[in-house]
Amino acid sequence: MRRQPPFLLAVVAILLAILVPAVWKVVERLNRPVGPTTGGEPWPGDEPVWHTRHAEFIADSQNGGYDVVCLGDSLTWGWDDHRDVWAERVTRRRTTFHAIGGETTNGLLWRIDHGELDGLDPKLVVLLIGSNNRWVKDDPDDIAGGVAAVVGRLRERLPRANVLLLGLLPQGWTADASSRPVFAEVNRRLAAFDSGPVSVRDVGGCLLEPDGRLSQATSTDGTHLSRGGYERLADALGPLVRERVGD
């Protein structure tokens, strides 16, 4: 049998040394999950703005001195544009809003696990999270389980704080919108968490018309709130927050 030239064997060896690890990296990447499998699994967001805001919130937490910390998704983020409404109708106590558009329980868990609450010692945490989980896993048990995981993490990280857990707010213009029964089931499950320092309140009815519709008086797109929506929400939240932290 003819022997291969030494230089050819050397080239083959070099190619194998380069290609085999690369192939294994591809295989490993293909075997990795592309997202969380349950609502209680910490998982970071994949958008640059998500990581930017997380870093901003870490820096904000180092300032400390907040009486109220509000955590959530775009519905909580919207308070940034209506801080005057919050101050006039909810409380003038020092409040910060740590919220990211499109956030899920997974992302919020990851943020908590990676320093976002470090330096904070609030009297109250207002939590509104879970509606975006529906786009990951449309299952009330899983969504409620994710919210429960967040509440548990808050109790671990901020043991002196009370938690005001809000039920998912209604979405969809009409009373028969597909999200309504899912959110109603989630809220029924969340009610079971009402105990001790954790208070659960379903205030979403304040946003609806008598026939169950969302209207442009409270919503901009059937999901997010208009100024009128934040005013109604503030009137519902005001007594709950002031009872826990004062005016």
Q: Where is each model-derived feature located?
A:
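N-terminal secretory targeting modules
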Residues: M1-L71, T76-H82, R242-D247
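Acidic/histidine-rich helix-loop elements
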Residues: P36-G45, D80, F97-T105, W135, ...
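Structural recognition of the beta-strand scaffold that forms the well-ordered cores
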Residues: V68-C70, R94-A99, L124-I129, N162-G167, ...
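Extracytoplasmic/secreted proteins, especially bacterial periplasmic and envelope-associated proteins
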Residues: C70, A99, E103, G107, ...
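Oxyanion-hole/transition-state-stabilizing segment in secreted/luminal serine hydrolases
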Residues: W77-T91, N106-A148, R153, L164, ...
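Second-shell loop/turn segments in exported
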Residues: T96-H98, N133-P140, A175-A177, S219-H224
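A non-catalytic structural micro-motif
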Residues: L158-L165, G204, L237
